[in-house]
């Protein structure tokens, strides 16, 4: 069911779940005679259901995901052997057993191998695109070699886990999340239930203030009235 909904949205640009939500919310607003002129909104970080990975684990698992889509016999004997080594490797054990110097050496080695793989195989798959993204975020190329970037250069919207490419990193107050941020808007009217009129979801790095206009437009469409008062915190 979810797959068919997503395929329909990709094909037509119409979000059926959003339409269904707005119709139901609108009927409740009308039934309960809620004016919709006063609303409040707030955001909340949502963690993705992904494992937190060390830098080496992230790079290794993304490479492995790519190698599983490749025909390894197209590689040179040396490259094929190294590819099979990475496919067999448990990256969490590698990290656990390695000291800092060994890990840095492994990161440099795997970076150069990734550069070779990207040059060898054509960019015809999502796995290739994901590996290219990871390489660009984690490495720079100097004198024909892959050089690991300083951690400070890696942005919050960089790949967190290849199993959820859209998840990003954000620290908000005391909360640190790899995932998403959702913005909820609801009606506020004394003596009447609060009806949710807008639910927006973006990657975690999305700023709260950027939700404002779309959330207001969604709410006004659902309630069929113009918002006069809006309660929100300073981030908006």
Each language-model region and where it sits:
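Polybasic low-complexity intrinsically disordered regions
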Residues: 1-228, 234
């Amino acid at each position: 069911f979810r797959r068919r909904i997503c395929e329909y949205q990709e094909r037509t640009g119409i979000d059926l779940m959003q339409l269904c939500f707005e119709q139901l919310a609108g009927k409740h607003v009308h039934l309960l005679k809620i004016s919709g002129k006063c609303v409040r909104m707030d955001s909340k970080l949502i963690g993705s259901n992904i494992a937190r990975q060390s830098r080496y684990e992230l790079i290794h698992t993304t490479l492995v995901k790519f190698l599983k889509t490749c025909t390894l016999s197209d590689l040179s004997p040396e490259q094929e052997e190294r590819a099979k080594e990475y496919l067999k490797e448990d990256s969490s054990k590698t990290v656990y057993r390695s000291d800092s110097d060994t890990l840095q050496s492994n990161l440099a080695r795997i970076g150069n191998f990734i550069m070779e793989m990207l040059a060898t195989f054509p960019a015809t798959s999502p796995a290739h695109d994901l590996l290219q993204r990871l390489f660009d975020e984690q490495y720079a190329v100097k004198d024909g070699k892959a050089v690991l970037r300083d951690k400070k250069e890696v942005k919050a919207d960089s790949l967190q886990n290849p199993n959820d490419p859209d998840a990003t990193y954000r620290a908000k107050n005391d909360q640190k999340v790899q995932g998403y941020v959702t913005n909820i808007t609801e009606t506020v009217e004394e003596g009447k239930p609060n009806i949710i009129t807008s639910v927006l979801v973006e990657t975690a790095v999305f700023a709260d203030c950027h939700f404002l206009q779309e959330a207001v437009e969604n709410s006004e469409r659902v309630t069929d009235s113009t918002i006069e008062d809006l309660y929100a915190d300073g981030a908006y």
